[in-house]
Amino acid sequence: MKFQAVVFDMDGVITDTEKLYRRFQLEEGRRLGIPDDVMVVACERIAGGTKYTNKQRFEEVVGMGIDYYEFREAVVNKLDAHIQAHGVELKPGVADTLKYLKEKNAKVGLATSTVRERATGYLKAHQIDRYFDELVFGDTVEH
């Protein structure tokens, strides 16, 4: 099969960060007194969204007068600290797949809700940024 172009997502596809987001979301939810079963539903609703769409989704599920942006900032701070200490893992086979696609002259894109600085940092850390022809980030799309 000949591929002309392939577009990837970042979290949970290129990098193994989705599980880290979930871990830190649940931790922060517990700290705020949100039951785990409610947080699991909230996490499912906000996965892959932007901070703007996620505010409404989070507040619809959680309610309780909890400020989503403060919650998000605490989660992102925990995520950043973890990645600073331990790095971020690629999902298995990612580098080989990207190399294969480029060898076949396929265009490769990334479309992610992750912000530019974080996403490009992940790509550069694993030296896979060179495989991407087009990049779209959560903070570069107008709402």
Where are these regions (language model features)?
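N-terminal helical cap/lid subdomain that shapes the substrate entry/recognition surface
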Residues: F3-A95, Y100, K104, E117
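Short catalytic-loop micro-motif centered on adjacent basic/acidic residues
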Residues: I14, G109-L110
